Amino acid sequence: MDATTTHSRLSEHDIYLFREGSHGRLYDKLGCQLDEAGAHFAVWAPNARAVAVIGSFNAWRDDAAVLRPRDDGSGIWEGFVAGVAAGDVYKYSIVCQDGRVAEKADPFAQYAEVPPATGSRAWRSAHRWADDAWMAGRARANALDAPFSIYELHLGSWRRAQDGALPGYREIAPQLAAYVVEWGFTHVELMPLSEHPFYGSWGYQTTGYFAATARYGTPDDLMFLIDTLHQAGVGVILDWVPSHFPSDAHGLAEFDGTYLYEHADPRQGFHPEWHSCIFNYGRHEVCAFLLSSALFWLERFHIDGLRVDAVASMLYLDYGRQHGEWVPNRYGGRENLDAVAFLRRLNEAVYRDHPGVQTIAEESTAWPMVSRPLYVGGLGFGMKWNMGWMHDSLDYFRHDPLFRKFHHGRITFSIWYAFHENFVLPLSHDEVVYGKGSLIGKMPGDSWQQFAGLRALFGYMWAHPGKKLLFMGGEFGQRREWTHEGELEWWVLDRPEHAGLRHWVGDLNRLYRERAALHELDFDEAGFQWIDSDDSENSVLSFLRKSRNGATVLVICNFTPVTRPNYTLGVPRAGFWREALNSDATLYGGSGAGNLGGVETVPVPAHGHYQSLTLTLPPLAVLFLIPEVDDARPDS
């Protein structure tokens, strides 16, 4: 029995945009579209011999709801099936050219069964958004000159239920919102929530590019979580993975019996490191699929930013491959020109349709102008992760403080390229897995020195130009390496050193948000000035951060466990400089050394300035000082 095809949702213009690769709203056209009488189904399977919808509503019979191919050569099969209701489970039964029958999940499904089950579910949202105030002001909160302190988390292992069960979107919403607000973060970044069959992939092996994972609840439950965060004034960034997809039989791989979403040649279509499939960005319909996925999360879920995973693997044809294992582009080079074109189209569409949103590239190479506009030849991302800063900083802090003077260039080098891109400074989940240990475990010395060292790293990070990203558990110094099984070690907060570290992060966030000098010119060299970058002997750095109106914050970093009294620094302004933050304060678990609230300048020239400060530098500590004249300025 054929499904009826009396009311196609696809116009000729839709088909044109689909074939051109520029359709960004396919989630309204393809997949399962419910109404009161049933559902319209449409699926792209150009090489199939036959396609049927099978599901709980027709006893999984492959002859009960047979779809018909459109007569326009688009490769889309469609039809209306009566009696389908929200929550019904279904799949496509696809007869391949060789006679094989594949049962596939719907690529455009907006809900799915809880893994390991693999069926799609019919869905229509009933959520009523209450985040109008956030959405109206989002462009300001998300601007490149605004503070970004991003709390990265894996939803399934942040907190668990008392019985150890996975949390629910709806249940965790008030806890998460209250936590990030209390500790001063401006945004959360959720590791991928698109449906994925293997929990241990953390969401990075996606099968459902339009479906929020059912492990934590329904799509409306996720909307409730995002709504709650927005109402608390917290932005939401979502990890999105257009770089590859898994080869699970129910997913996109060989969808209609042919290599439809991926390349047929394994040198182009198979990822040797991840054992996954690579999208064929040269196929326009695939680009429209991915573009629609990105816009779906922004429009239907009010996501404020997309962190695009593994961009480097998209840009290079030889990524993870040896000589002879890859196919050069038409010019003989290793650049993936189709992926470049797709990323530019993606960013063009996002910033055109959602100017208050940011796209953030996880890109680990020196590809030029990743976060520069399209009109100057860039890829068009809003920001890019600074992997060089992360590697150099962690390498420096791993060294015994006694020997850091021999590695001083590691900690100063990042400033030389800090303004080439719009950088995010990431201490992400990638640095606390696969045997790398925890952040606190990377610090040398005894327990006191480890906590002092991590406070110093965070102080340096929050003072350094660039937006901030910290993975959950780092804020209180979890000692165990992160695992997706179980929750964070919340119990360690009963210990003063862990609680003190979290208090330090909270105060860093507060100062960072309050002081324009610490965030307004993150991407402009006018916002940074060295006082002294060359004191390698003492492992001391000192610099100024500046706002547009000239307000300043002085930052001094002492990366050895030696108190340094009578340390002289030249400064640009005479008068009293208040010690706004000191990571060695007893409140944070430090020794209490410092400058009794601040220091008055003396007319002694130093470091190119006519006046100077004589300071006590606490051990393994970072100081933030603010001139008294700037304390009274509301826009400083």
Curated annotation (Swiss-Prot):
Any single biological process term in GO: glycogen biosynthetic process
EC nos: 2.4.1.18
GO molecular function: 1,4-alpha-glucan branching enzyme activity; cation binding; hydrolase activity, hydrolyzing O-glycosyl compounds
A single GO cellular-component term on record: cytosol
Pathways involved: Glycan biosynthesis; glycogen biosynthesis
Reaction(s) catalysed (UniProt annotation): Transfers a segment of a (1->4)-alpha-D-glucan chain to a primary hydroxy group in a similar glucan chain
Protein keywords: Carbohydrate metabolism, Glycogen biosynthesis, Glycogen metabolism, Glycosyltransferase, Transferase
CDD domains in alphabetical order: AmyAc_Glg_BE, E_set_GBE_prok_N
Catalytic residues as annotated in Swiss-Prot or TrEMBL: 309 (nucleophile), 362 (proton donor)
SUPFAM superfamilies, alphabetized: (Trans)glycosidases (SSF51445), E set domains (SSF81296), Glycosyl hydrolase domain (SSF51011)
InterPro entries in UniProt: A-amylase/branching_C, Branching_enzy, GlgB, GlgB_N_E_set_prok, Glyco_hydro_13_cat_dom, Glyco_hydro_13_N, Glyco_hydro_b, Glycoside_hydrolase_SF
Pfam families per record: Alpha-amylase, Alpha-amylase_C, CBM_48
Family of the protein in this entry: Belongs to the glycosyl hydrolase 13 family. GlgB subfamily.
Subunit structure: Monomer.
NCBIfam families: branching_enzym, PRK05402.1, PRK12313.1
Function of the protein: Catalyzes the formation of the alpha-1,6-glucosidic linkages in glycogen by scission of a 1,4-alpha-linked oligosaccharide from growing alpha-1,4-glucan chains and the subsequent attachment of the oligosaccharide to the alpha-1,6 position.
Name of the protein this chain belongs to: 1,4-alpha-glucan branching enzyme GlgB
Protein source organism: Aromatoleum aromaticum (strain DSM 19018 / LMG 30748 / EbN1)
